[in-house]
UniProtKB/Swiss-Prot annotation:
Residue stretches spanning the membrane: 27-37, 55-66, 70-78, 96-107, 112-120, 146-155, 160-167, 186-194
Protein's name according to its UniProt entry: Outer membrane protein A
Organism, scientific name: Shigella flexneri
Function: With TolR probably plays a role in maintaining the position of the peptidoglycan cell wall in the periplasm. Acts as a porin with low permeability that allows slow penetration of small solutes; an internal gate slows down solute passage.
Cited InterPro entries: Bact_OuterMem_StrucFunc, OMP/PagP_b-brl, OMP_bac, OmpA, OmpA-like, OMPA-like_CS, OmpA-like_sf, OmpA-like_TM_dom
One Pfam assignment: OmpA_membrane
NCBIfam families: PRK10808.1
Length: 348
């Protein structure tokens, strides 16, 4: 019968629905089980009646999961009441116990484990019988026996799991005290509830690095100033008003604005350097008056450096024509350097 019970357990395990069983590390669980309890090698005093070795077994257990492979369980088992009848003796035997085992598991899939439990059971066995002549007999015994179990465990949800298990307990009782020393096999179906299995905190992607922006604006000096002057014209103020609205839209979180003034090559280097500085400062002063913080903006005169006309005006000799040809060199460049946060949309 023992071999038959083991074979049935293995066969049923083969049909277990594939699904993650081990609880999270360092968490507790509790459960209950119900199944077929079968006594073996009962060894009663010779009797000519039946011994009902197959009974209903049940139990409750609690455990602590150390990691996906190792846990510890403590539980109570009711192994069933076994009646026996005959001309020589009529009575019943029952056994129950508290067990402590180490549970060793291995994940087959995310939701399915196979496992074994190894440990011991502190049991109590009771017998009560009527013997020929009308006398009665009643006694009990206690002891410790090894426990071996194997099974599969399937996680229905992160909190709830079910298990199919076959458990073997050896030598429950003392034949000299209660008349028998049987072994017990318990094939059971159990369900457990795991604590602390809530969803893991979502992984938050690191914030994207701030985006460094640099914007360049170029304004013609002939629009901003009269020739050879550094005072803004009304048309120049209007142009700077439009520029200021663009700077406001850029809205750097932190950064700076640099105003670069350029002249053409007419006149001495020193004069052109001074004129470019005064023009750049005029633009800075106006933008500060519009609202740009004074500590975020600066002026720099570049004189006649970096001409954009190149040598296109080299053959122009008439002064008026040369002034007109060199107009692109007379300019104000505004460079805005800032850091603008990158806004990311949350994922649905």
């Amino acid at each position: 019968m023992k071999k038959t019970a083991i074979a049935i357990a293995v066969a049923l395990a083969g049909f277990a629905t594939v699904a993650q069983a081990a609880p999270k590390d360092n968490t507790w669980y509790t459960g209950a089980k119900l199944g077929w309890s079968q006594y073996h090698d009962t060894g009663f005093i010779p009797n000519n009646g039946p011994t009902h070795e197959n009974q209903l077994g049940a139990g409750a257990f609690g455990g602590y999961q150390v990691n996906p492979y190792v846990g510890f369980e403590m539980g109570y088992d009711w192994l069933g009441r076994m009646p026996y009848k005959g001309d020589n003796i009529n009575g019943a035997y029952k056994a129950q116990g508290v067990q402590l085992t180490a549970k060793l598991g291995y994940p087959i899939t995310d939701d399915l484990d196979i496992y074994t439990r190894l440990g011991g059971m502190v049991w109590r066995a009771d017998t009560k019988a009527n013997v020929p002549g009308g006398a009665s007999f009643k006694d009990h015994d206690t002891g410790v026996s090894p426990v071996f179990a194997g099974g599969v465990e399937y996680a229905i949800t992160p909190e709830i799991a079910t298990r199919l298990e076959y458990q073997w307990t050896n030598n429950i009782g003392d034949a000299n005290t209660i008349g028998t020393r049987p072994d017990n096999g318990l094939l059971s179906l159990g369900v457990s509830y795991r604590f602390g299995q809530g969803e893991a905190a979502p992984v938050v992607a690191p914030a994207p690095a701030p985006e460094v922006q640099t914007k360049h604006f170029t304004l013609k000096s002939d629009v901003l100033f009269n020739f050879n002057k550094a005072t803004l014209k009304p048309e120049g103020q209007a142009a700077l008003d439009q520029l200021y609205s663009q700077l406001s839209n850029l809205d750097p979180k932190d950064g700076s604005v640099v105003v670069l003034g350029y002249t053409d090559r007419i006149g001495s280097d020193a004069y052109n350097q001074g004129l470019s500085e005064r023009r750049a400062q005029s633009v800075v002063d106006y933008l500060i008056s519009k609202g740009i913080p004074a500590d975020k903006i600066s002026a720099r005169g570049m004189g006649e450096s970096n001409p954009v006309t190149g040598n296109t005006c080299d053959n122009v000799k008439q002064r008026a024509a040369l002034i007109d040809c060199l107009a692109p060199d007379r300019r104000v460049e505004i460079e805005v350097k800032g850091i603008k946060d990158v806004v990311t949309q949350p994922q649905a």
